[in-house]
Regions:
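Bacterial N-terminal signal peptides that target proteins for export
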Residues: 2-9
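C-terminal motif of bacterial Sec signal peptides marking the signal peptidase cleavage site
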Residues: 17-20
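N-terminal maturation segment of proteins
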Residues: 22-247
Length: 247
């Protein structure tokens, strides 16, 4: 009987509590009250989620390295126009971040907010400098894109096909690099001769190598045979060879 009384009392309390929290659907909430109903943390976390997805789209190689193959055939353009576009996007992202009420965020999201703000401010500051004029680099330069392919995980024939498509698109970045460097030289931007000499040497070594020793072909030559039916790997190698020779 005691249990019944407690259970009954609890049920009555819940009924009154629920009734007190209900809002008449016919009542027209003001804009301010509507905004208060929406949890600031939910909106902020949605913002971060959208930022992450956009970042993967903007950095397809990074996405592939994480195992996300949604953008496995894409590359990031290194044209000056793309740098300008990215700078404007960063500024817009910061404006959207500043719209959140920091005080309404929980402790975890306050930390996320600070980190995101630092990241955006650093990226915007870096975008003020024309780094595209100084893209010659002994590591990670236009001549060593094959190293990116070496870091990827190949789990199927399609992964190799995707990399071949990426290589075909990368020809545009090679042309962009040439244009950017020439524009930079006209404006007085250039890397130290120590760097440029080493880069030229690296490029010469690739251009003067036998095709079977070309680092861009290595990925296809060493492809896992189990991913291919009869004749498919040979066809892939032939197409890769034609692409490399044409560039």
């Amino acid at each position: 009987m005691v249990f019944f009384n407690k259970k009954t009392s609890l049920s009555i309390f819940l009924i009154f509590f629920t009734s007190a929290c209900q809002i008449d659907s016919n009542v027209n909430l003001g804009d301010d009250l509507q905004k208060q109903v929406i949890d600031e943390n939910i909106v902020f976390e949605k913002y971060l989620s959208n930022q992450w997805e956009q970042n993967l789209k903007d950095r397809p190689i990074f996405a592939s390295l994480l195992g996300n193959k949604s953008f496995n055939q894409d590359i990031t353009s290194n044209s000056i126009q793309e740098f300008v576009k990215n700078k404007a996007k960063l500024q817009k992202d910061l404006i959207n971040l500043n719209r959140f009420n920091y005080e309404k965020l929980n402790s975890d999201n306050k930390l996320n907010y600070k980190l995101k703000r630092i990241s955006l401010n650093n990226s915007i500051e870096a975008a003020e400098y024309p780094s595209y004029y100084m893209s010659l680099n002994q590591r990670g330069g236009v001549q060593s894109y094959f190293e990116t392919g070496d870091r990827l995980v190949y789990e199927s024939k399609q992964d190799y096909e995707d990399w071949l498509i990426r290589l075909s698109k990368y020809a545009d970045n090679i042309a962009n690099t040439k244009t950017n460097i020439e524009d930079g030289l006209k404006k007085g931007y250039t890397q130290p001769q120590l760097v440029t000499r080493q880069v030229i040497l690296q490029i010469d070594n690739i251009l003067n190598s036998e095709i079977v020793d070309n680092p861009y072909l290595k990925i296809f030559l060493t492809a896992d045979n189990s991913f291919f039916n009869k004749g498919e790997k040979e066809d892939l190698i032939n197409r890769a060879t034609l692409l490399i020779k044409s560039q």
